[in-house]
């Protein structure tokens, strides 16, 4: 675990999550600013969030996995795909990035367009119970899309994972905005709420709904539909951050072999 945290690759990954969430929140919230000359449309906001997540998944996904969402990070932990320590660092980086992105937009947007900075709230007489279920469903489909399109075990063509994920986020917003403003991402809800100091009594909805929805998707995908053939000790090693796959061992063996050959010469 200590080895994982101290590695340069791990630090780069944590920074990538911070940066990606900052950019995602900035562009997403900016699309919802209420300019007096032209109010935003549902389609505009949905496309902005979808394009932002697709772009960032393509750009920074190779560095960190492109979670950009605490619900997805925690779901991958539930699915035994990442270590506990990585999950903690990622979630902290995402939340700080979301606050930074919302803060930058707050400083740049004029007061007459800023509004409430697109803080999530319950719309159209939606009850907290209804909102939780909606957020669960929206995030469930997003998480399934992410798990399937980025699964290295797939042998069938998957196309562009970034495009698929971006379209999934767009789909969620086209439906969810009418209910909750559409979160699907606790960081997206947390950032502007901190900057605007507007934590409504229903703020918990935007944590519980996405996290539960993504976790259910992880259980379904990684344990029922496409389970990993890992032993209990290997699963524990994944959580602890000490697991090394056969591919990792093979790469290390080849590196040692090359080093020995160079030393011999």
UniProtKB/Swiss-Prot annotation:
Keywords: Cell membrane, Cytoplasmic vesicle, Glycoprotein, Membrane, Repeat, Transmembrane, Transmembrane helix, Transport. It comes from the Eukaryota. GO terms for cellular component: apical plasma membrane; basal plasma membrane; cytoplasmic vesicle membrane; endoplasmic reticulum; microvillus; plasma membrane. GO terms for molecular function: identical protein binding; water channel activity. Residues 66-74, 181-191 dip into the membrane without crossing it. SUPFAM superfamilies: Aquaporin-like (SSF81338). It is a multi-pass membrane protein. It is found in: Apical cell membrane; Cell membrane; Cytoplasmic vesicle membrane. The chain crosses the membrane at residues 13-33, 40-60, 88-108, 127-147, 159-179, 204-224. Pfam families: MIP. GO terms for biological process: camera-type eye morphogenesis; carbon dioxide transport; cellular hypotonic response; odontogenesis; pancreatic juice secretion; protein homotetramerization; saliva secretion; water transport. Residues 1-12, 61-65, 75-87, 148-158, 225-265 are cytoplasmic. A motif (NPA 2) lies at residues 185-187. Its main location: membrane. InterPro entries: Aquaporin-like, Aquaporin_5, Aquaporin_transptr, MIP, MIP_CS. Belongs to the MIP/aquaporin (TC 1.A.8) family. Homotetramer; each monomer provides an independent water pore. Interacts with TRPV4; the interaction is probably indirect and regulates TRPV4 activation by hypotonicity. This is Aquaporin-5. The lineage of its organism: Eukaryota, Metazoa, Chordata, Craniata, Vertebrata. The gene is AQP5.
């Amino acid at each position: 675990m200590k080895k994982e945290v101290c590695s340069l690759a791990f630090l780069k990954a944590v920074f990538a999550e911070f940066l990606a969430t900052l950019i995602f929140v900035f562009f997403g919230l900016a699309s919802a600013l209420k300019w007096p000359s032209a109010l935003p449309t549902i389609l505009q906001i949905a496309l902005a969030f979808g394009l932002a997540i697709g772009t960032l998944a393509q750009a920074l996904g190779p560095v960190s996995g492109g979670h950009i969402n605490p619900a997805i990070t925690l779901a991958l932990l539930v699915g035994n795909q990442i270590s506990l320590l990585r999950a903690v660092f990622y979630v902290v980086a995402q939340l700080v990035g979301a606050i930074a992105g919302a803060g930058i937009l707050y400083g740049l947007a004029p007061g007459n367009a800023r509004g409430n900075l697109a803080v999530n709230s319950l719309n159209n007489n939606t009850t907290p119970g209804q909102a939780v279920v909606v957020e669960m469903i929206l995030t469930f489909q997003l998480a399934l899309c992410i798990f399937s399109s980025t699964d290295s075990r797939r042998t069938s063509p998957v196309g562009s994972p970034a495009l698929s994920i971006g379209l999934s986020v767009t789909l969620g917003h086209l439906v969810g905005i009418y209910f909750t403003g559409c979160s699907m991402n606790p960081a997206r809800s947390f950032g502007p709420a901190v900057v605007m100091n507007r934590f409504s009594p229903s703020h918990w909805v935007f944590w519980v709904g996405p996290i539960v929805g993504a976790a259910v998707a992880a259980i379904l995908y990684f344990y029922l539909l496409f389970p990993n053939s890992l032993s209990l000790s290997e699963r524990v090693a994944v959580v602890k951050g000490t697991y090394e796959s056969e591919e990792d061992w093979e790469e290390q063996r080849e590196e040692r072999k090359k080093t020995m050959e160079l030393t011999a010469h």
